[in-house]
Amino acid sequence: MGVRWSNGTITAVINDASRGTIYSSMQTIRSVCNDVLEDGAETGRDIIGNTPSALVPGKTDRIDTGHMQASVRHDRMKRENPSKMVGAAGWTGTVEDYFKVQEEGGMSSGLRMGDRYITPMHMLVQMRLIMESDLHQRLRDEFGN
């Protein structure tokens, strides 16, 4: 059995097991991963809501229209074949160019705010660290070791 995390995507694979074992283990892994993905998306929205603005002094969040925060979602685990499932959390829907600038830092250009440096938010990195730790702990709780 293996669970891999890469770029906001969780991949679960079970090899060399009987069909019954695969089904039972995959059901448990699917449930654990779906919980982690859902919690991870909520964490991402919280990070946006609690990371001070890079543009407005004294503003305690990065919410203007709410679109960037609302775009943080999760895709539940989907079966790719009998022994493999994939799911994701983060900006899984429409991604605007400014999301990347908020995430990684860089120059903001626009008529409303003018050109200003945006400090990075690092939401995706923070999400990954939290979700990875949560996933490992929940799998240890379910399967041991």
Set out the residue ranges of the language-model regions.
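Short, Lys/Arg-rich flexible segments
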Residues: 1-88, 99, 103-145
